């Protein structure tokens, strides 16, 4: 029985040693896993931060591009509006053809009313008769 007890004792020591090694191995593996997870997490966070920064920068660039296009479009619309108003003024006789496109000093203004067709015979503006008009009474 002594041999049997000695064998069981040795087996127990082996199991304890194996358990210690397993515990140590599991702890080491857990530590490495934790390091790996933290590393991946930090790299993912860096990637997300970089990605968000990149998206924000691209959005800013696109807004700048769109803003520039809007300003350019508004400028073009304003220019065409001025040209159209000048055409109407000349065609109706509000302004004489030789007065169009000149600033206060009498110098021609650039970009206004270029190649505008004007009827040179229409020098005066006549008011239409009032027979076809009705007075407007706003509703209260």
From Swiss-Prot:
The modification N-acetylmethionine is found at residue 1. Its main location: cytoplasm. Residues 100-140 are annotated as: Disordered. GO terms for molecular function: copper ion binding; cuprous ion binding; identical protein binding. It comes from the Eukaryota. The gene is SNCA. One of its GO terms (cellular component) is membrane. This is Alpha-synuclein. InterPro entries: Synuclein, Synuclein_alpha. The modification Phosphoserine is found at residues 87, 129. Neuronal protein that plays several roles in synaptic activity such as regulation of synaptic vesicle trafficking and subsequent neurotransmitter release. Participates as a monomer in synaptic vesicle exocytosis by enhancing vesicle priming, fusion and dilation of exocytotic fusion pores. Mechanistically, acts by increasing local Ca(2+) release from microdomains which is essential for the enhancement of ATP-induced exocytosis.
């Amino acid at each position: 029985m002594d041999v049997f007890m000695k064998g069981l004792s040795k087996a127990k020591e082996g199991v304890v040693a194996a358990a210690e090694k397993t515990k140590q191995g599991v702890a080491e593996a857990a530590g490495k896993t934790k390091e790996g997870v933290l590393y991946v997490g930090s790299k993912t966070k860096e990637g997300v931060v970089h990605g968000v920064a990149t998206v924000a920068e691209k959005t800013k660039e696109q807004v700048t591009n769109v803003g520039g296009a809007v300003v350019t479009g508004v400028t073009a619309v304003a220019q065409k509006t001025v040209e159209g108003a000048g055409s109407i003024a000349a065609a109706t006789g509000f302004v004489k053809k030789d007065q169009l496109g000149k600033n206060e000093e009498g110098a021609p203004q650039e970009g206004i009313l270029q190649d505008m067709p004007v009827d040179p015979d229409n020098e005066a503006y006549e008011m239409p008769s009032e027979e076809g008009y009705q007075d407007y009474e706003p509703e209260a």
